[in-house]
Amino acid sequence: MPTVEESALRKQMAAGELSGLFVVAGEEKYMVGRLSKQLIKKAAGGTFPEFNNQAFTNESSLEAIGDASQALPFFAERKCVSVSDFDVESKSADELNKLYELWELCPETTVLVFWYPTLDFDGKRSSKWKKFLKQAEERGAVVLCGRRSRTELLRFLAREAEKSGCVLPRPSGERLLDYAGEDLTALKSEMDKLCAYALATGQGQPPEITREMVEDMVPKSTETTVFLLANALVAGDYEKAYGLLDVLFYQNEEPIAILGALGASYVDMYRVRAALESGHPYQDAAQYGDYKGRDFRLRNAQKNVRSISQGVLRQSLHLLLEADLALKGSRLEARIILDELIAKLLLAAQEDRV
């Protein structure tokens, strides 16, 4: 069975049609964890879980995993053997051959689940991972949980609010995404906090999560703070720009990470400006980068480029490159380099208005 959609796996679970091997991985770790736990619970059943639900990790021996796989279920139709974060790169060729043989010999009464709640891998570049996925597709199903689109994230947040007995208006959801980012684990945590506050204050029936609550209670992610910094730079807002840089250093963010995120914001603006000047909508810039589930970056860039020329954007990218080289090769303190960069970017934006 080839790579399947999450929805297809849910249908299999609902129908009780579980057998063979499943590999559950992907960028969206919240969904990897939730889907895998549901799969493991369904495959193991509720009978004698201490025998029929056996969990292993990357540190477990292949012999132990193999023995568990070969053992018959205890007073049940099937059992589940799960392995979390099995790192193919850390295994020898002999070990991997043993793994694939283990898959081949696994009895029909055992459901094997290899799931990746924390480990990321590149299945296209690494020959080991490429073979791992190919072998898995030949013997079972591979489910990759990708990043959600902004619309899907808004629906997720609305459902979580409803489960808790609250209402999340779309503007509040939009603001939450802008501030907390698009990682579902982080969003779920912030949503739980907002719902608890809304229920405690009892504003409305059911309680509504307002934009003011989001503004006051949700800490801004590094990416969001850098977006706001880019906005301030383009607007020529000296005080706000340096204030946001202070916030980033106060949060102990790595200077190279700050510069990287700021550079990404300027690249977004450059791409959007190029699309608009070519007579295309700003959304066309998405074809030049990975913007799936991150289209808000292009919307943010589109607002900024109204007041800045392509020439200034090119100059700004050159300044960012100089700062990057200075951070990596200069003896100057990182704060001094970034302070100087902010001044130069503000000056470039100001000259565009003269």
Where would I find each of the regions flagged by the language model?
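Conserved beta/loop motifs at nucleotide-recognition and modification sites
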Residues: M1-V354
